[in-house]
């Protein structure tokens, strides 16, 4: 069963993450936040496309079998394997009927769509890589502003965004961060974190990513004497 965002970390791992963020922010004015979501979008078009393809495929199989059996019966052959014709496709094609195939597609479409909606991971094969990447990035940007992570004094907040369905990690820095740290650096950490999550090292890989973020932030944004903790340290859901 697919793990949910609310169940990704154990209570102990949640505590370790909070401690890791506090430690990472000890020597920097930068702020680290982490957010986990079940998915970045509902991907309704994948439900539609997937249901259409699957219903069409299975309807084709059923119609082909039905047409071939009709051909066997009309020719007076037996129904056993001994009666299997070498001209299977031609026999089936001659007896296939569009007027039964299309209604069958229509009837099967809705059960398949319901099935895909209940098991979101089935949507992934019907999505392009670009669609997934852009969606996760846009959801991360939206979350950054929805959760008001941009409201740090020196614009030094970063968001570690994890989208479980897509198996994607996106690290987003505020304007102050991006002025000094290249986005490629965050991409490397995101890739390492994604690999750790795939290996089911959830808490450990997140804590390691937070630590690396803190080290880089401390080099460019040393802690100020009047610095305060501006963002919550708990995992955002």
Where would I find each of the regions flagged by the language model?
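Flexible, solvent-exposed short loops/turns enriched in glycine
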Residues: 3-4, 166-201
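Juxtamembrane "helix exit" motif at the C-terminal ends of alpha-helical transmembrane segments
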Residues: 56-80
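Soluble periplasmic/extracytoplasmic beta-strand elements of cell-envelope proteins
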Residues: 31-36, 157-163, 170-172
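Cytosol-/stroma-facing membrane-proximal "stalk/adaptor" domains immediately downstream
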Residues: 184-237
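Short, charged cytosolic
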Residues: 8-33
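Transmembrane alpha-helices and immediately adjacent membrane-cytoplasm interface residues
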Residues: 66, 70, 90-124
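Perimembrane loop-to-helix junctions flanking transmembrane segments
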Residues: 73-94
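Canonical alpha-helical transmembrane segment with a positive-inside/aromatic-interface signature
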Residues: 115-158, 173-180
């Amino acid at each position: 069963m697919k793990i949910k965002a609310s169940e990704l970390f154990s209570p102990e791992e949640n505590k370790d993450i909070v401690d890791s963020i506090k430690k990472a922010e000890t020597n920097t004015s930068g702020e680290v936040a982490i957010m986990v979501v079940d998915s970045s979008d509902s991907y309704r078009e994948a439900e539609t496309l997937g249901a259409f393809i699957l219903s069409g495929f299975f309807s084709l199989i059923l119609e082909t079998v039905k047409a071939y059996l009709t051909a066997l019966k009309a020719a007076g052959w037996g129904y056993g394997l001994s009666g299997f014709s070498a001209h299977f496709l031609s026999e089936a094609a001659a007896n296939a009927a569009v007027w039964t195939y299309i209604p069958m597609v229509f009837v099967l479409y809705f059960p398949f769509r319901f099935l895909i909606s209940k098991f979101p991971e089935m949507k992934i094969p019907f999505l392009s890589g670009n669609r997934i990447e852009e969606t996760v990035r846009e959801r991360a940007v939206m979350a950054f502003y929805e959760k008001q992570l941009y409201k740090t004094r020196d614009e030094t907040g970063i968001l570690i965004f994890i989208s479980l369905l897509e198996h994607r990690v996106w690290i987003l820095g505020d304007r102050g961060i991006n002025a000094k740290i290249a986005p490629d650096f965050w991409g490397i950490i995101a890739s390492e974190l994604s690999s750790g999550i795939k290996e089911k090292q959830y808490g450990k890989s997140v804590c390691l990513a937070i630590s690396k973020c803190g080290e880089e932030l401390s080099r460019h944004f040393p802690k100020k004497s009047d610095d305060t903790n501006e963002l919550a340290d708990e995992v955002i859901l």
